Amino acid sequence: MFFHQRFVPGLAIASYLLGDEKTGEAVVVDPTRDVQPYIDIAREENLHIKYILETHIHADFVCGSLELQNSLSGHATICVSGHGGADWKQPFADRELSEGDRLEVGSLNLEVIHVPGHTPEHIAFVVKDASRNSDKPWFMFTGDFLFVGDVGRPDLLGEDEKQKLANQLYDSVFDKIAKLPDYVEIFPAHGAGSLCGKAIGSRNSSTLGYERRVSEAFKETTREKWIETLLEDMPLSPSYFQRMKKINRDGPALLGSKRHSVSRMP
């Protein structure tokens, strides 16, 4: 298996290139708009990118899924969450994914888990490697649902949605991933410095077991107290977040070109 984490300082963005070296198939998770590094690394490793995945509709940076697909002459399938309903449907995507769906990338199996809370449509990908053990999960791409030392903030869609999303986040943390074993590694979409969480740790990966033991997000308490602790002292979100989320929902224009099929923001 080939695994590469690409980390962009400043906004502290983490994206991933994962591939099966025997079959040459690969997948990119949550790409940024600067797509050349993914293409260069894939070429160096003799990989061809089969899927481009988004864990959710990002609010802090322009997602590079369309840019990457275009640079690959359309030879990659863009997969997004199908749990967003009419408000958060991404019309440019080739495929919508739902809870329990699986993607095959050579010997690698990526299973979809719907983990709402940071956003309504948020999904995570649990990865198994059949060349090692087809029954045991190895790691998980958690997007902005679960960070090192933190969880994704539930207040980015405004006051009307904040409490609903916070309740969903509680269920995602204590129910949806409860059966995953402690040894599962987590690879989030952000590190320390991102405003997509309140107190994200400085490491760029962890394990579920470690987070369950030390993270404030996993401390057992009542639902009401957990949500109260989550929301207190939450920093203000940047003013561009809501606009950016809509751009990523509709599909950002390709760099240096015009895309008439995309709903452009005023």
PLM regions and their residue ranges:
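Short acidic-hydrophobic surface loop/beta-edge motif
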Residues: R6, L18, G100-V105, F125
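Active-site-proximal beta-strand elements of phosphoester/diester hydrolases
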Residues: F2-F7, L17, V27-D30, N109-G117, ...
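Histidine-centered catalytic micro-motifs
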Residues: I52-V62, H114-H122, I186-S194
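Active-site HxH/HxHxD metal-binding segment of metal-dependent hydrolases
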Residues: L11-A12, T23-A26, P31-H114, K128-A130, ...
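Divalent-metal (often Zn2+) His-rich catalytic cores of metallo-beta-lactamase-fold enzymes
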Residues: R132-F139, G149, E161-S261
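Active-site metal-binding loops of divalent metal-dependent hydrolases
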Residues: P31-T32, I57, H83-G84, H118-T119, ...
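Divalent metal-coordination and catalytic microenvironments
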Residues: L18, D30, H56, L68, ...
